[in-house]
Amino acid sequence: MAESEAETPSTPGEFESKYFEFHGVRLPPFCRGKMEEIANFPVRPSDVWIVTYPKSGTSLLQEVVYLVSQGADPDEIGLMNIDEQLPVLEYPQPGLDIIKELTSPRLIKSHLPYRFLPSDLHNGDSKVIYMARNPKDLVVSYYQFHRSLRTMSYRGTFQEFCRRFMNDKLGYGSWFEHVQEFWEHRMDSNVLFLKYEDMHRDLVTMVEQLARFLGVSCDKAQLEALTEHCHQLVDQCCNAEALPVGRGRVGLWKDIFTVSMNEKFDLVYKQKMGKCDLTFDFYL
């Protein structure tokens, strides 16, 4: 989905009509007609997959993963179109046929729920990095994102958008189910489960986890250099002039949520996540 100024913003009703239901999950229109092909998509042992619910820090994670796996540096990444190097499986461009033919090792992204990913991934045939973000910051970022889109723009209020999020009525379905599905597979040998907030709280440990998971061997000095480069990426992402002020910071929701909204959100969160031992930092 290209981010650009909206030409014809959608009312809440029009916005909703653009999605379609697939096995009970609301998906964007560009996924229509290709879900079976996605399920049968051939994966390779050398593939590395990055999977997130939208606005979970995907752009930052892909740059960190590329840096760690390829030995790149922040300046090099800043000069390249990183999205061309890490295509999104279900997006119209470049398309499944092109992704199938990419040379190994492929780095592939997706926002699809675990159950809709290629079946070979369920069999442990490729490495999967999943990153979750606290849902309060995520819904603020998701709202800002939809306000900027050309084809899926949103004209409603943040309060209404947040209700849709709590009621599982946004693209890619329920955030609550999305993260819990992957949390249940966090011990799978081919899955690494990360949290966005840890990039800000303990980046050293995250870089160590990524290097170990990706099979990148490095001594202490190399690890320190990698971490410093990753710190640069995090700083660049959170301070980029093109982004709304502070969009990447932890605790963004506190500037947007009213007391009433926060109370309602906490109640829904407790109802839908109460049986799950996954926890989040809502501020640092």
UniProtKB/Swiss-Prot annotation:
EC number: 2.8.2.-
Tissue and organ distribution: Highly expressed in the cerebral cortex and frontal lobe, slightly less in the cerebellum, occipital and temporal lobes, relatively low in the medulla and putamen, and lowest in the spinal cord. No expression detected in the pancreas. Highly expressed in fetal brain and occipital lobe, slightly less in the whole brain, frontal lobe, hippocampus, and lung, very low expression in cerebellum, medulla oblongata, temporal lobe, testis, kidney and appendix.
Designated name of the protein: Sulfotransferase 4A1
GO BP: dendrite arborization; steroid metabolic process; sulfation
Keyword Lipid metabolism: yes
Highest taxon listed in the record's lineage: Eukaryota
Localization annotation: Cytoplasm
Entry's transmembrane regions: none
Gene3D superfamilies noted in UniProt: P-loop containing nucleotide triphosphate hydrolases (3.40.50.300)
GO molecular function: identical protein binding; sulfotransferase activity
Coiled-coil zones: none
Keywords: Cytoplasm, Lipid metabolism, Phosphoprotein, Steroid metabolism, Transferase
Entry's Gene Ontology cellular component terms: cytoplasm; cytosol; mitochondrion
Keyword Lipid metabolism: yes
Function: Atypical sulfotransferase family member with very low affinity for 3'-phospho-5'-adenylyl sulfate (PAPS) and very low catalytic activity towards L-triiodothyronine, thyroxine, estrone, p-nitrophenol, 2-naphthylamine, and 2-beta-naphthol. May have a role in the metabolism of drugs and neurotransmitters in the CNS.
Family: Belongs to the sulfotransferase 1 family.
Modified residues (Phosphothreonine): T8, T11, T205
Listed InterPro entries: P-loop_NTPase, Sulfotransferase_dom
Pfam families per UniProt: Sulfotransfer_1
